[in-house]
Structure formats: structure tokens, C-alpha cells
Amino acid sequence: MDTTIDYFTKAFTSAWNSLDISPIESLLDDNFHYSSFWVLEEMTTAEQYLDYLKGKFATLRRSGSLVKAEHIPGKHFIILTQDNRNRCGIILTVNDLGLIARADMMPIEFCR
């Protein structure tokens, strides 16, 4: 398996653009953590995050909201745009096992 950051950011981009968790399911460490700048509590398992993301994607499909994810070669984050106006980034951290250890959603200004 490719373990470059581009491999992982492309998988996350694919998941968000297709509103389908399958591109990232096998790439998350069991002890994966997810945090959001806008939410106080952190998720602490891959299972918890994937369940959350399934629900999030279902809500986005039902609402008809347009979400676009962008992969930027060589960067450790993706950019999300919702309804052509709300932009944020998801920064990924990969561990020594070659799995995604965490994802942090935050304002795009914090992504570099």
C-alpha cells in the first residue's frame, strides 16, 4: 500500500466528493482521533468517526447541499467547500504504521 501523504489526502478527497466512507475505511488506525475547531469533544476511535461520517454524508445527500473536496499535491490537508461559500480544511496525520492517526477540521486559514 502506498503510504505517501498524497495517497491519504486523495482518499479523503474521494470520500468527501462521493459522500461515501469506503475510500478511507481501511486507512484509519483503530485509535484514530478526529477533532473539529467548532466542536468541543474529540472522537477517539475509527468506528466512532466512520459512524459519524456516514450520518454526515447521508444528511448532505438529503439536503442537496453541494460539497466539494480538493486535494493539493504534497500538502497534508484537503480543502472542503460547502455550497460554494463555506471553506474549511481537514489536516491529516499519518502514523508509523502507515495509517491515518488523526484528522483535524479547522478554518482554512490554519492549514499550511
Ranges and model annotations:
Residues 1, 34-37, 102-105:
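Charged, low-complexity, helix/coiled-coil-prone segments
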Residues 1-2, 46, 99:
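Intrinsic-disorder-associated interaction segments
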Residues 1-22, 26, 30:
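Short, low-complexity N-terminal intrinsically disordered segments enriched in polar/charged residues
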Residues 15, 39-40, 91:
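Short N-terminal micro-motifs specific to bacterial/archaeal maturation
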Residues 22-71:
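A solvent-exposed, acidic/Ser-Thr-rich amphipathic alpha-helical stretch
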Residues 50-112:
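A beta-strand edge to alpha-helix "cap/lid" segment located at domain peripheries
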